[in-house]
Swiss-Prot record:
Record domain GMPS ATP-PPase: where: 2-184
Name the UniProt record assigns to this protein: GMP synthase [glutamine-hydrolyzing] subunit B
Coiled-coil features, chain-numbered ranges: none
Pathway of action: Purine metabolism; GMP biosynthesis; GMP from XMP (L-Gln route): step 1/1
């Protein structure tokens, strides 16, 4: 287990040595990983750090506004790139190809922003499980295996690449980051794109966004899952108002875990599952069916893609 009082000064020193007197941008998502990196980097290089948040169009409901509010004290640069990411994903159905398309687009946007700022370094919040899954061929993370082979940066700096998620939270508490950040549930870097099986479309994104919002409203505060979400996994036949309906199938996932390397599905009460089904199918007319995924990790991964 990490000892924050020892880790923090070492990480700050490492960032200072790697960036020297250069300028850096940091990929800030608002999650605990990137937020910890931002605080460490700010302590290391101060005003030579520029945090950048990219609105990919693949975010949860209200995500960009939430980020603006939380980081209003910082000189946060927000880049709106929805059209660019959707164009990069058009026609792609394979999950690995989707992750790589997202990783490539992320890097190209960051390169463009870095050139404007004359920044030569990119700081990002890669953690140890990201590396394990990418290097082990389980799935490419957009910030590891999903990155292009040629990048216009002197170096990518990853201050917390050897930490597990629970260790990152310990460091976040020690850095006195806001509770909302320290306790924030993990959200994948590729966003809702990996909660949509097959090609990403505007319609699927809207369905996934609304379904995820409902699931979080119903489960987060009451059951405190390590992670919970909804995924669009295909289409199926249903009946609405005595009329045949061919609509989307939503899979709900809620798991408990310590570090994300293994996970168990939560045994949710039947009345809770019924309420989830009722809300999702009534509030999202294009949904015909709701299922609950009870598969642990392994053999499954937490996210569907």
């Amino acid at each position: 287990m990490v000892k924050p009082e020892k880790f923090i000064p070492k990480a700050v020193e490492k960032i200072s040595k790697e960036i020297k007197d250069g300028r850096a941008i940091i990929a800030l998502s608002g999650g605990v990983d990137s937020s910890v990196c931002a605080e460490l980097a700010h302590r290391a290089i101060g005003g030579r750090l520029q945090p950048i948040y990219i609105d990919t169009g693949l975010m949860r409901k209200g995500e960009t506004e939430r980020i603006k509010h939380i980081f209003s004290h910082m000189n946060l640069d927000i880049v709106y790139a929805k059209d660019r990411f959707l164009a990069a994903l058009k026609g792609i159905t394979d999950p690995e190809e989707k992750r790589k398309a997202i990783g490539e687009t992320f890097i190209r946007v960051f390169e463009e922003e870095a050139r404007k700022l004359e920044a030569d370094y990119l700081i990002q919040g890669t953690i140890y499980p990201d590396r394990i899954e990418s290097e082990g061929g389980i799935k490419s993370h957009h910030n590891v295996g999903g990155l292009p082979s040629v990048m216009d940066f002197k170096k990518i700096v990853e201050p917390i690449e050897d930490l597990y998620k629970d260790e990152v939270r310990e460091v976040a508490w020690a850095l006195k980051l806001p509770d909302e950040i320290c306790e924030r549930m993990p959200f994948p870097g590729p966003g809702l794109a990996v909660r949509i099986l097959g090609e990403v479309t505007e319609e699927k994104l809207e369905v996934a966004r609304e379904a995820n919002s409902i699931v979080e409203e119903e489960l987060l505060d009451r059951f405190c899952p390590w992670q919970t979400f909804a995924a669009v996994i295909g289409k199926g036949t249903g009946v609405k108002g005595d009329i045949r309906a061919y609509g989307w199938i939503i899979a709900v996932r809620a798991v408990g875990s310590r570090d994300g390397m293994t996970a168990e599905a939560l045994e949710l009460p039947w009345d809770v599952l019924k309420k989830l089904e009722s809300r999702i199918t009534s509030e999202i007319p294009k949904v015909a069916r709701v299922v609950y995924d009870i598969t642990p990790k392994p053999p499954a991964t937490i996210e569907f893609e």
